Each structure stands twice: as C-alpha cells, then as structure tokens.
Amino acid sequence: MFFNPYLSGGVTGGAVAGGRRQRSQPGSAQGSGKRPPQKQFLQIVPRGVMFDGQTGLIKHKTGRLPLMFYREIKHLLSHDMVWPCPWRETLVGRVVGPIRFHTYDQTDAVLFFDSPENVSPRYRQHLVPSGNVLRFFGATEHGYSICVNVFGQRSYFYCEYSDTDRLREVIASVGELVPEPRTPYAVSVTPATKTSIYGYGTRPVPDLQCVSISNWTMARKIGEYLLEQGFPVYEVRVDPLTRLVIDRRITTFGWCSVNRYDWRQQGRASTCDIEVDCDVSDLVAVPDDSSWPRYRCLSFDIECMSGEGGFPCAEKSDDIVIQISCVCYETGGNTAVDQGIPNGNDGRGCTSEGVIFGHSGLHLFTIGTCGQVGPDVDVYEFPSEYELLLGFMLFFQRYAPAFVTGYNINSFDLKYILTRLEYLYKVDSQRFCKLPTAQGGRFFLHSPAVGFKRQYAAAFPSASHNNPASTAATKVYIAGSVVIDMYPVCMAKTNSPNYKLNTMAELYLRQRKDDLSYKDIPRCFVANAEGRAQVGRYCLQDAVLVRDLFNTINFHYEAGAIARLAKIPLRRVIFDGQQIRIYTSLLDECACRDFILPNHYSKGTTVPETNSVAVSPNAAIISTAAVPGDAGSVAAMFQMSPPLQSAPSSQDGVSPGSGSNSSSSVGVFSVGSGSSGGVGVSNDNHGAGGTAAVSYQGATVFEPEVGYYNDPVAVFDFASLYPSIIMAHNLCYSTLLVPGGEYPVDPADVYSVTLENGVTHRFVRASVRVSVLSELLNKWVSQRRAVRECMRECQDPVRRMLLDKEQMALKVTCNAFYGFTGVVNGMMPCLPIAASITRIGRDMLERTARFIKDNFSEPCFLHNFFNQEDYVVGTREGDSEESSTLPEGLETSSGGLNERRVEARVIYGDTDSVFVRFRGLTPQALVARGPSLAHYVTACLFVEPVKLEFEKVFVSLMMICKKRYIGKVEGASGLSMKGVDLVRKTACEFVKGVTRDVLSLLFEDREVSEAAVRLSRLSLDEVKKYGVPRGFWRILRRLVQARDDLYLHRVRVEDLVLSSVLSKDISLYRQSNLPHIAVIKRLAARSEELPSVGDRVFYVLTAPGVRAAPQGSSDNGDSVTTGVVSRSDAIDGTDDDADGGGVEESNRRGGEPAKKRARKPPSAVCNYEVAEDPSYVREHGVPIHADKYFEQVLKAVTNVLSPVFPGGETARKDKFLHMVLPRRLHLEPAFLPYSVKAHECC
C-alpha cells in the first residue's frame, strides 16, 4: 500500500511513503520562509496505488507544490530545480577565438527593436523596427550544446513592376490588407537583372524589382497577397533560412565556423551550454567534413490505463498516463571521455562510461511506489499523473536531447502527453523546449482534421483511442530537438506482414520482447509495488529496443546526409517529402546563373505557417481541416515520387520556407509569351501562346508472352533510367523551346521529342545551353562516384558507414527528379519535360528489343561473345513453344539435331528492363557474357550516360502477366518473384505455404517441370481425353492434402490469419462490408485495443453462425479447432456471398457447367460477416470457414500456374483445378462416428 499524504494538500514537511520517513533534499523543498501562492491542479491517482488491488481513481484538487520522490528524497518540481540523478556537468568557460560547431537544427523567428532579449547594439540595428533571427542549434567539437543567433538576414522576393517608388507604396498598402496579425517591418525595393528559368531564348525579365523586407512573417503574407492579385512574382515562398543557406553557402547539417560574435551570459534565449550572437556575414561553412560530434539522444515510451477497461483515450480524464520510460544515450563521434569532456567529478558523475544522464541512462517515471526494476535504473515516484507529466517534461528540458525517438510516438505517445497537458491540466508545453515561447520556441505537432475524429468518437465511443491519424500525416516540431519516429522508418525500410515493435526487434535485433497485454497492465499496476515494477520493466524494454533499432538502422545518418545535400533542415527531410529537396537544390543552382523560379497562384492556396508565427499561445496540438502536403513522410526517402496522375495529388506540396507544408502549385504549367518576353504561367489547358495541354503515357510496359519457360531468361535493365535521360538529352526548364523565344536556333542544335498524340517538344542541345537539371545531376553523379571510391579505400567502419549513407542520399535524390517535374500538384511541374522523359524511355526500350531481335540470334554475332562449350547440345530444330505436343507416348519426333542453333527473343519489357529468352545457350554462359552483351548494346544505341546493364539470368521462369512473374535465378537459392500472393502481405501463411510447395515442385522437380510444359501445349479436349500429364499429379496430390488439412482440423489459426491495411480513419470508409472494418467494429464493441491508421488489421474467416468449438474436434494447443461448413448450409441460404469471396463447388465431373447446378456456392457468405479477430478465435475455439480457405488456395495456385493451363475460347482457367481435382466428401464432425461404423459394417 502507498500512503499518499498529499491528496489533502498543504503538506510542507517530510512525507511518509510506503511506511518510510522521507528525507527532504536541502534547498529543494523550500520549507522555510513564505511560499508564493500556488495555482491549484487536479490530482488523479489510481486507487490501487494507495490500497493494493483496488480499482478506480481518486480525483482531488490541491494547491500545494508538485512533488517527486527520488531514492526516498522529496523534490519540489519547478523550472529552476536541479535534477537529482547523476549527470555530467557541462561547465563551459568563455571561448576565445573562432567557434567551430556542427549544426543539426535551425529555426527562424522575428524579433522587434524593443525585444527583452539581451542583444547588443551591433545586432539590434537589424531589428529596426523588426528583423529576422535565425537560430542554429548544434554541438561544438568538444560536445557542448550551442545556439548561434544569426542577425541581418532579410527576406526577399522578386516582382515585375515598372515604377520602383510606386511598388514601394503598393507594398505599404498591401501591408495594411494582409490577414492579422500584422507587425511593423522595413522594406526596400531595388532593380534586379534576372531571367526566368522557364524557356530557352527568353530575355531577362524587364522591370524586375527585388523586394526586401526585414520581417519574414510580413514578407510572406505580402508576397502571397500580390500573387493572389495577379502580380507576376517570383520565389515568394523562400524563407530567410533558405536564403542564408544559398546566398552564404552555409550547410543545414554539418560543420560551420563563426569568427566574430558576442557571447551571451545574461538574457539567454535558449537553454544550451553556449549561446552567441553574430552577423550573417560572420557565419561560414566548413566544407569537406562529414563527421559528427556527440549528440544526446532520448528514447521513450509511455504506458496508459483506461478508466473503462478499453484502449486509452487522451481526451478522457480517466484514461491516465501511469508510467514513462526513458533511455538516454549518445550518437555520433568518439566517446565524451576521449574528447576531454569532464565526466562529473563533483560527486554527481555517472557511474557508467559514456553515460551522460543517470547511473546507467535508464529512467522510469511512475505514479506511486515501485519495486526493483533493474540494476542502476533511476526510478522517480510521483503522487499523481499531473506531477508525473510535469516531471517528465522538466527532465526533457534538463536533458535537452538533440534527437528524440520512440515507436509510434508521433501518433500516440507525444500526442497523448501533449493532449493531457494542454487540455486537461492547461499547461503550456512549449516552454519545455530549448527555446522559451517568447523567443520563437515551439513544442507541438500537426494532426489531421478534427472533424472525422469527432465522427469516429461518436460512432465508436470506446474506440476513440486518440489515434485517428496516420504516422505519415502527423508532424512533430520541437525547437532544438529532431524527432525520428522509428515506426514509419521501419515501415519504409522493411517489407513485413506487420510492423509491431516485437516483429521489428526480431528482424533487426534477433530479440523478442516480454509482452504484457494492455488488459494486464492495469491489473499489475494496481496490485502492489512489485506489480508496478513489472509494468516498469515492460515499459523500459520498449525504450531500450527502440534505442537499439535507432543505432542499428542508422536512419539519422541517412537523413543528415540528405539534409546536407539538399540544403534543407533535417526535420524537413523527415516530414516534408522529396519535392522540397529538389526545389531547394534547383534554387541553389539557379542562383549561380542569375535564374529565378516563378510562382503562380491557385485557388485554395493558403499562407503557410512558419516557425516564426505562433499558432496559438497554448497550441501544442494543431488540428487543421486540411494540411497541404501532408503526404510527404519518411517513406519518401526510399521511393521515387509517383508519376503524373490525372487526379489531384497531395504529394509533397511543400513550399520552401514554411514551417508547415503549403501547396506550392496546383494545375499545369503551360508556356507562352508574356509581357516580359519570358514564359507565361497558366492553370488553363492552353497557355498564352496557345500551346495545347500536355498528356502522356506513364511507365512503359511491353505486354509479356505469358507462359512457363524452361530455357534461360536474361534480364537487362537501364541504370538510373530517368536521370540518365535528362543528362543525355539536356532536358530542362531552361532548354525548352517555347513561343516567345527571342533567338533563332539552328535545327541541328535542337532535340525534338514527339509524343503519341502528335505533340512535339523541343529542347536545345548542350552545345547551345547546358541544362540546369543536367548539370546538377552530373555534379551529384560524379560526387557519388567519388564517395563510393572513398568507401573502397576506407578502413574505418564509422567513416565507411557515413560515406555509405552519403552515397545513398545522392542516389535517392537523383532518382526524384522525374517525379519533381511530373507531379501536377508539385512545386514546379513541367509536363513537357516529364512527357519527354517517358517517351524517350519508351523509345529506348523499343530500340533495345529490335536490336536484340535482329542480332542476338545471328551466328556471326554470337561468335564474338560465346565459345563452343557455351552452347546447349541437342536442341531440336522443330522444338519450339508453338509446336503442340501430346501426352506421353503420343509425341512425334521431328527434326534432327542442331548443336549450335540459338534463338533469342524479348518476352517482356517493364519501364527500364527487358527480359530476353535464350534457347541454345547455357545459363552459366549468359551470366558470364551478359555484361559484355549489355555493354555492346549501350555502345551501339545510346549516348552517355545512358547505360544498359546485365542484371541476372532466370534458369526457369513463369511469366504470369505484366508485373507478375516467378523464376529461379542462376546462382541463387530460392525463387525470385514479383506481384504474386507469396510476396503480398494480405495472404495467409497456409495459402502461402501450399503455393510455395507447388512452386517448389514446379521449379525443383524435373518431371513436374516437363509435365507443366506438356500441359501448356494441350487443349482442354485433349486433357478431358487423356488426362493431365503424369508429373502434374504431384501438384494435385499436394492440393488434396491441403483440402484435407482444412476440413480435418489440422491447421493452426496463426497460419490462417489474413490482413488488410487501415489506410484511413474508419469513419472515412464508404464501404462497410470490408472484413478489416468489421473486425475493428467488433474490437471496439468489446473495448479491446484498436489498430492505428497505417497498421495492418488481422482477421480470420470463421464458419457462419457458429461461435463454439464443435464436439469431437481436437485442440492440442498448437492445432486450432476448425469446423466444417455443411454442404446444406448453402441450401439454407446462410452462405450468401456478396463480395466475390467464394467460387462454386469444385470437382464437377467432365467440366459440367455451373448454371446446370441448382445449389448455391458453398463459400458464398460475405467475408465481412465471418471475419473475426485471431485472438478471439483462438481463445474461444471458433471454427474456421474451410470452404473459403480452400477456395483461396485454389485461387493462389491458379494465379501462378494459369500460364500452363490449357487455353482456348471455351476454356476457363479459373475452373481448371476444380475440374481435375478428385472429389472427396467431408462430413460434419458429429457424423464422423457414424461414418466409421458404416465403414466397419461394410
């Protein structure tokens, strides 16, 4: 029992907890003197904390000071308290000379001349009447945290206007019309000479003015207003940080040096060890150094308890946070001791080497007393939830991590904590970051719309678990700390049936967590102190596993390399997708050439929120009805932006310089002559010059020659196809010939691309003007080549890992260029470029196929690449796939032997790869000579840097349809497959296992392979007359075994689990007849834990109308009781399929048509009606729907074997297995004893 004397309030002396007298830390309790009046707060305490085993909560308002107990010592929680655990002191003396520091995060803010910050007159001049301040957070070479305040960077954009003075007056007038809040600013207008990047031959933009405004908040509002009113403006959404990075060549992630500065001792804006002020001209980058200093990291996890016994909801006052675990560790350079940082010799030092906060870096915050959690774990005990949350936030502020991680913390843990603090306890969480709120500090997250959240809560009160948003859509911003949620990282990095922490721990760490059900957590927590220790160990292990995942995957190194390359803050790499990376890189490249990037206005464009604008004084969670660009996420790091879609897309609609994602452009750029002689921009289908709207085909696919190939199939693909096309053909905004171009161009210097609809796009060649995109790509490709060369020579594993992340960042960013030009709602779409890239890719694929057809079968050509031993001896001249072969004993021999006859043919082409079937050559010879063949094709057909590469050779291949195939690769174990059920996450393990066995027979058993080839050459009538080839019987035997396993209760429920992704909030689904939605509703009705948006929902198909285990069935723990659906169920109408899940009863003799049978299909019940949670099925012995599962088996096997089934106009391949499988009657379990007796009587 835990005695809590603080429920009555007003206690100032020692406290008794657990029967022990508590000692007060000197100076911490402030027992003497008058205490300032304390605002009351609500105490919520589980009753079981005070009375072991009791349920319920105790709620009480008190006016006393919040408290914490650490090692039996009472501590008052306040902002000026000294955290009691051991921690490494960072006593920093005044630094003399230049400061070299590594920056990892940046924020922008607007200060006014009367700001209370301690700014010297040297820099305060930049604040008249207001000015931008850019704060660079980082660490010095010795590991001290630092904040560098940079003054003097103005915000500017460009506008076409003939009268400079008049434009200044217009801007002053616009400043009075923009939305509130409006703040004072200084403005200057100067003429500029720049050229729009759109179009070759355009003149410099006439009457171009550079509008410079001291206040970024007002600069953005004024620029957007001018854009809305139709003024031709350029680069209005580029923030001052991006301006500084580009104009001064500063890095957003890497080493910098500040040469002249003022040291801040008093009036600091941040909580960093070092804070200095400098002018924008005093900050310089330190190039060619990709090393890291040591950064503090924090991994945390929370445990909650619902007052109603369901899954906890943050908005409900009874659903409280009961424990928080934290793991403090470091990442980056060498150990702190090696770098000469003192390790706390004042008696507060850490006991473990490299630990900078606590005895071992492991911390547990809990309500009530707690037993022994583990050796050297620092345990903090709190009387109530409010004090627990306040203690954690103070701990967070004291520790001041550079990186914060966890598992699904964006959508749950952080969101839960901030919701409780903001809406229940009215605490401003933003004051706990490295910047106080007044200095532009932010501690908040963007969440999806609250509208459907309310609908969800109304429809399912017990299901409103405060997690309606997907992780990808929730963006977290903490000033001075970068949040890396490992849940979306794992989803982007791996292909797994589910992404639970336990699954990822097994995959990456070879570890399993000791699981504790959320239903058992409340029971253990209220039991006693030892029960709370058990929950604490469970909570702590999650934080430890996430730390290990963080250090194993090393995503932070990869993101840091991209931030440095793309010149954007690290948090934007994590949350804002790929478009902003290309835009900023393009902006940087254009700045060197006096190019500018135009803006255009679209309906619905809103002024983006930025770091410098407070959304509300206490807004820790910002819910917006529509946050443009929320689709950008960590996943975007590992895939290209999608090609152009006809429907509007929210992909990466991010404007440079905004803290959130404002859609930068909607509609299609079309080009025409404008008043400036430059390129006009329009949202209409036709530009000013009358150019027709552009449409084009997407990814190139040659229709495959479906079938099973026992001959080797070589695969060739183009290396970095789309980037190489841009470089090879000089494609760019700046090389596109458009109406209004001033200079005539020699036709020999023009590269033309004609689309399928007859529209032609023309680009000047590199001899006339080098493409900006091409030069940027060339620079990055060369840089990647140099990095990979350094990797080969590097011996240091840490340095090698950093180089590997850098080359990967270069590769991913290069591959994003095509999507940048082709996404209609992107930041700078240019459909002529995207359409031309696609068309050139199609032409390259077609030319490759023709070249292979014309040359690869010619003896004189083959003689240059292959030797005598490379040919297959004994190839029949007449043995081709077109010749029909009868079953065994009926084949006719034809043709003699031709030892060196080779046939090569392209059987499939997919975007950037071609599949070539070779007859007459060994697989080993193709593997050895494949690179030489690819090099020869490249030299004959293409220009640099386009390169055709040899990828692999399939020894045998089943070509099912486009983007779906299975094959056995030469020199590799197992099968390579794409698009089949075996690699889909929705199929259950039982179906996958049967399909895998069938494929193993097909590819490993020679007799089965030959039988499959013979079967593919038979007609349906021949199969009816002669039967299937003998070797194919083995496949049928495996299917019969699978059918018996299902009907005779031999299959575990774990192997029958199906799944679907919850892609959006449940209230947004229009279809109610989806199995996973039905399962979520059943879980909500039982108040069980619900999945998050983005999770996979698992379910099992159960027998209709049955909810108990049938008598006589076996259940040995591993095997699950499975019921058999009676054939009479269909007659009664209980098996009525409305979702296409069932097929008609199999095994009709002689292929009897379905319409002649009166009975309904045996599997005709809707899937959503019989879908159930696997745990519920296992616990209650619910029988499964054997018919449906066997239909799934037949469908899966048919999908992979259909190319070898007999064809013809009257043949239905989906019914073939039903026809050839032997029939068998499965009785209900209740009838089995009678069937045995009848058998004995016979």
Curated annotation (Swiss-Prot):
Keyword Electron transport: no
Region Disordered, residue ranges: 14-38, 644-665, 1109-1162
UniProt keyword Transmembrane present: no
Biased composition (Polar residues): 1111-1125
Keywords: DNA replication, DNA-binding, DNA-directed DNA polymerase, Early protein, Host nucleus, Nucleotidyltransferase, Transferase, Viral DNA replication
SUPFAM superfamilies (alphabetical): DNA/RNA polymerases, Ribonuclease H-like
Any one annotated GO CC term: host cell nucleus
UniProt biased composition (Basic and acidic residues): 1145-1155
GO molecular function annotation: DNA binding; DNA-directed DNA polymerase activity; nucleotide binding
InterPro entries: DNA-dir_DNA_pol_B, DNA-dir_DNA_pol_B_CS, DNA-dir_DNA_pol_B_exonuc, DNA-dir_DNA_pol_B_multi_dom, DNA/RNA_pol_sf, DNA_pol_B_thumb, DNA_pol_palm_dom_sf, DNA_pol_type-B
Enzyme Commission (EC) number: 2.7.7.7
An individual GO BP term: viral DNA genome replication
Reaction catalysis annotation: DNA(n) + a 2'-deoxyribonucleoside 5'-triphosphate = DNA(n+1) + diphosphate
Subcellular location: Host nucleus
Low complexity composition-biased segments: 653-665
Major location (coarse): host cell
Family: Belongs to the DNA polymerase type-B family.
Role according to the record: Replicates viral genomic DNA in the late phase of lytic infection, producing long concatemeric DNA. The replication complex is composed of six viral proteins: the DNA polymerase, processivity factor, primase, primase-associated factor, helicase, and ssDNA-binding protein.
Quaternary structure note: Forms a complex with the ssDNA-binding protein UL57, the DNA polymerase processivity factor UL44, and the alkaline exonuclease UL98. Interacts with the putative helicase-primase complex composed of UL70, UL102 and UL105 proteins; these interactions may coordinate leading and lagging strand DNA synthesis at the replication fork.
Protein name: DNA polymerase catalytic subunit
Organism for this UniProt entry: Human cytomegalovirus (strain Merlin) (HHV-5)
